[in-house]
């Protein structure tokens, strides 16, 4: 690494960020996920930073190169991001990587050397940058609490999540979904550490060294997506393991009960779970080396109990954990409950034997789902008659609008008290006439971002262009006495890329002039427009079938949801590539391709049973409700 000639960069405080801009920022790390492999070949890291304005910014950073992402070791580190793109998603400002994105990371400890961490060979770092890092260190020392999650083994307790700085002594592959790490930090756990049975495993490491340190080493099982990281680790390297989980297990041996402490790194990246290799120059590694050197290598070997005899409490010799040892090594649920937490869990085998209607809380894995092509899951639903219908395809919608364009606009219906009208004639289309009516607000034409257009004779392409420039567009045609809506096969309102449809069965269309009764003629709320026009609006919903398996039984549950389950609006997903990618990532995380179900995450769900009668046949069906994807699951 070397410095390049100084360039004057401008850094934007976090309280002054605006969507659609590309900025340079400094911040103190408040939360982060170590880089992990996302869908495809890119690595992803999630970093939340804060600065002196006390405004937080969450950044989603992607790169095909693991080392190109910020090299963050703990909360409190200071980062500098260049060319960070700012966007607004779900009303929250967030940062994402843009072309040329670059980062530097600094230790946040007061008095520590200011040494930039970066994989770049060349970077810019001036005296002003030096001052900025020092200023943020001072501010963070009085405004941010030290990380309480970073613990030594001597301080850990059962049922705890913590970060551990340690040295790797040995490793072994257990199966495709789990991996064993033997580590130490120079201190002893308050309870004897469990031991994974390794007689059938190939252990890499100095066995005699491990044996001499057996009272100071712990066995950690890592699962799922962390396995490929564990495989790549070198024995002797210094690690930081994030969100390590402890659990106390009792064991019966020779008429006495003893306790052992288990260590698990569960699958997924929730709560920042992951593994990072620390360089030997890291200040925490310096302290760790001192602890290891001073550790008493001749500690009393008889005070620890090696747990290898009881099959119920040690790792099976076959090297595989039963899929449904839920209480032992499950990861945190990839979904969360939004209500009814008082309900006890019910196994699927019991649910399948009970009559409907009932409500249940379950914990299961997603064995499969339909439809596999996720865009096919988006439907239109009438909340009144409960009719489900397909979302019209672009080609079908274009035909509907072209049919409406065959009628010439009636001159008598133009330029009324409600709207001003403009007519143009198309070229090379037999002189097709298109009428655009600009709806007025108290007799005055509003700005384009507040203006509603009524369009006669427009094609889908023309309407889409107008909907990008104006607040809203309603396709209409000339009636006998007034403008009227097209058949409800077409949208009754178009806003940007979102098409709002109405139910043909439940709607009773009223005159376009009823738009005059709307008090607010600037925001054009779809439900308000629908109400004055006599339309029962259809809702965009995701409709899917989940095959759930908890080891006691298999059950098919129906999901129908507009935006709560995926936290993605069904109305927007068809026109937004980023939302489609997010949904693909969620489903690939629920039901990962190419691996066994053992490695799938658990889903905590509420389901309700109900009876469906088809002729003389009665069937019990199940539907997921009051459940949502955990926000930090990806």
From Swiss-Prot:
SMART domains: Telo_bind. The keyword DNA-binding applies. GO terms for molecular function: G-rich strand telomeric DNA binding; single-stranded telomeric DNA binding; telomerase inhibitor activity; telomeric DNA binding. One of its GO terms (cellular component) is nuclear telomere cap complex. Coiled coil: none annotated. It is found in: Nucleus; Chromosome, Telomere. The keyword Nucleus applies. GO terms for biological process: regulation of telomere maintenance via telomerase; telomere capping; telomere maintenance via telomerase. Keywords: Chromosome, DNA-binding, Nucleus, Telomere. CDD domains: hPOT1_OB1_like, hPOT1_OB2, Pot1C. Pfam families: POT1 (PF02765), POT1_C_insert (PF21375), POT1PC (PF16686). InterPro entries: NA-bd_OB-fold (IPR012340), POT1 (IPR028389), POT1_C_insert (IPR048953), POT1PC (IPR032042), Telomer_end-bd_POT1/Cdc13 (IPR011564). Gene3D superfamilies: Nucleic acid-binding proteins (2.40.50.140). Homodimer or homooligomer. Component of the shelterin complex (telosome) composed of TERF1, TERF2, TINF2, TERF2IP, ACD and POT1. Binds single-stranded telomeric DNA as a monomer. Associated component of the telomerase holoenzyme complex. Found in a complex with TERF1, TINF2 and TNKS1. Interacts with TNKS1. Forms heterodimers with ACD. Identified in a complex with ACD and single-stranded telomeric DNA. Component of the telomerase ribonucleoprotein (RNP) complex that is essential for the replication of chromosome termini. Is a component of the double-stranded telomeric DNA-binding TRF1 complex which is involved in the regulation of telomere length by cis-inhibition of telomerase. Also acts as a single-stranded telomeric DNA-binding protein and thus may act as a downstream effector of the TRF1 complex and may transduce information about telomere maintenance and/or length to the telomere terminus. Belongs to the telombin family. This is Protection of telomeres protein 1. It comes from Macaca fascicularis. The lineage of its organism: Eukaryota, Metazoa, Chordata, Craniata, Vertebrata. The gene is POT1.
């Amino acid at each position: 690494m070397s410095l390049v000639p100084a360039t004057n960069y401008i850094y934007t405080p976090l309280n002054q960020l605006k969507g659609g801009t590309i900025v340079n920022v400094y911040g103190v790390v408040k939360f982060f996920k170590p880089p992990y492999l996302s869908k495809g070949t890119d690595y992803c890291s999630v970093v939340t930073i804060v600065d002196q304005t006390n405004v937080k910014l969450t950044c989603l950073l992607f790169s095909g190169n693991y080392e190109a992402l910020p090299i963050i070791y703990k909360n409190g580190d200071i980062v500098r991001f260049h060319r960070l793109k700012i966007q607004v998603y779900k009303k929250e400002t967030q940062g994402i990587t843009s072309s040329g994105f670059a980062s530097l990371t600094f230790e946040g400890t007061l008095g520590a050397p200011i040494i930039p961490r970066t994989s770049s060979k060349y970077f810019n770092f001036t005296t002003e940058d030096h001052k900025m890092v020092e200023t943020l260190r001072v501010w963070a020392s009085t405004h941010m609490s030290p990380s309480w999650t970073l613990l030594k083994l001597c301080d850990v307790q059962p049922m705890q999540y913590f970060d551990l700085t340690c040295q790797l002594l040995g490793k072994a592959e257990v199966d495709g979904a789990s991996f064993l790490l033997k580590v130490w930090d120079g201190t002893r756990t308050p309870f004897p550490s469990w031991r994974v049975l390794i007689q059938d495993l190939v252990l890499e490491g100095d066995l005699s060294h491990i044996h001499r340190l057996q009272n100071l080493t712990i066995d950690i099982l890592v699962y799922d997506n962390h396995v490929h990281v564990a495989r790549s680790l070198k024995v002797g390297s210094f690690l930081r393991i994030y969100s390590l989980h402890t659990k106390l297990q009792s064991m019966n041996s020779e008429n006495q009960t003893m306790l052992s402490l288990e260590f698990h790194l569960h699958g997924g990246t929730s709560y920042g779970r992951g593994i990072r290799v620390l360089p030997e120059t890291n200040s925490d590694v310096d302290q760790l080396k001192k602890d290891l050197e001073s550790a008493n290598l001749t500690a009393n070997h008889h005070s620890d109990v090696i747990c290898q005899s009881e099959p119920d409490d040690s790792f099976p010799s076959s090297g595989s954990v039963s899929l449904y040892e839920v209480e032992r090594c499950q990861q945190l649920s990839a979904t969360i409950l939004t209500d009814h937490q008082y309900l006890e869990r019910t196994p699927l085998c019991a649910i399948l034997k009970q009559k409907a209607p009932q409500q249940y809380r379950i914990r299961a894995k997603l064995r499969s789902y339909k439809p596999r092509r996720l865009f096919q899951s988006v439907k239109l639903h009438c909340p009144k008659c409960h009719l489900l219908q397909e979302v019209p395809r672009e080609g079908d919608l274009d035909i509907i609008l072209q049919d409406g364009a065959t009628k010439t606009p009636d001159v008598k219906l133009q330029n009324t008290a409600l709207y001003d009208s403009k007519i143009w004639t198309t070229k090379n289309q037999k002189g097709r006439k298109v009428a655009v009516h600009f709806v007025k607000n108290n007799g005055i034409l509003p700005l384009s971002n507040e203006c509603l257009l009524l369009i006669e004779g427009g094609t889908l392409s023309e309407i889409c262009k107008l909907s990008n420039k104006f607040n809203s567009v309603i396709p209409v045609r000339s009636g006998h006495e007034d403008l009227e809506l097209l058949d409800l096969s077409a949208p009754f309102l178009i806003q940007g890329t979102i098409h709002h449809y109405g139910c043909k069965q439940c709607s009773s269309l009223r005159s376009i002039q009823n738009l005059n009764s709307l008090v607010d003629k600037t925001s054009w709320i779809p439900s308000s427009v629908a109400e004055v026009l006599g339309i029962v609006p259809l809702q965009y919903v995701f409709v899917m079938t989940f095959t759930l398996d908890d080891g006691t039984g298999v059950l098919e549950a129906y999901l129908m949801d507009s935006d709560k389950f995926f936290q993605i609006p069904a109305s927007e997903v068809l026109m937004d590539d980023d939302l489609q990618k997010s949904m693909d990532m969620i489903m690939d995380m629920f039901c990962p391709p190419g691996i066994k179900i053992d490695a799938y995450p658990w889903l905590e769900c509420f389901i309700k049973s109900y009876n469906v009668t088809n002729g003389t046949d009665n069937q019990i069906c199940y539907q997921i409700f009051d459940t949502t994807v955990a926000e930090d699951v990806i």
